[in-house]
Design a protein with these regions (language model features):
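Glycan-recognition and catalytic cores of secretory/periplasmic carbohydrate-active enzymes
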Residues: 1-217
Length: 217
């Protein structure tokens, strides 16, 4: 997948890192909201392509553009008027790694966050998304997977709760996504609270499931 930033009168400009980062995050949010795995696949593909196109050979971060003009080698870091595309990609890698149980994505995200740690410490107000990335590492992080025929309605109800340091995902069908494998039952919908590739006892009620996350109660 290759994105086009602008197109006018048969002239086009190739997409920059912001285009890939924001589209990847938007697609991930659609996956979380609908359970449609095509959105997850698209989000992952966009993120993978961003890593290939914008890799910087002198750091663990990503460049603004993949052409060789000097100004495009700039690496955007601050979460100012809009979040840094690097902070968004770090967040995406973290979420993808937790959904597919892939340490490579998690390690790439860790390297990106570690490389800006000193900058963030001195001016956290300008690095809010980076700070959230750090928070996901300082406190335990959980996956909340809602799986079964009523996954959509239960997931919608869970969004009414404050659930920091979690990612909430859903599936109403049997799936090969690692977080969902062998957890689908056609006659019941279960809520799984998982951490470090292991899920706790599945629950059918939201309050009982969230009790498994210590800082929510």
């Amino acid at each position: 997948i290759k994105l086009i930033h602008t197109y006018k009168e048969n002239q086009f400009q190739e997409g920059v890192l912001e285009d890939y980062a924001y589209l990847s995050k938007a697609s991930m949010r659609l996956f979380q909201a609908t359970g449609d795995e095509s959105y997850f696949d698209f989000s992952k593909n966009i993120t993978d392509n961003a890593l290939k196109l914008f890799a910087d050979d002198q750091s663990d971060l990503l460049r603004y553009s993949n052409n060789n003009e000097l100004f495009t080698k700039v690496i955007s870091l601050d979460d100012g008027v809009i979040p840094s595309p690097n902070s968004i990609i770090a967040e995406q890698l973290f979420n993808i790694g937790h959904i597919i149980f892939d340490d490579e994505y998690l390690n790439l995200s860790d390297k990106m966050v570690s490389s800006v740690q000193d900058i963030i410490d001195g001016n956290i107000n300008s690095y809010s998304v980076w700070a959230n990335n750090i928070l996901n590492r300082v406190e335990p992080f959980f996956e909340i997977a809602v799986i079964g025929p009523n996954a959509k309605s239960i997931t919608d109800d869970i969004t009414n709760y404050f659930t920091p340091n979690t990612i909430v995902v859903q599936s109403k069908i049997e799936s090969i996504i690692p977080l969902f494998i062998d957890r689908y039952f056609e006659d019941e919908t279960y809520i799984y609270v998982c951490q470090n590739k292991t899920c706790q006892r599945p629950e059918t009620k939201i309050d009982l499931a969230l009790e498994q996350i210590p800082y929510i109660n």
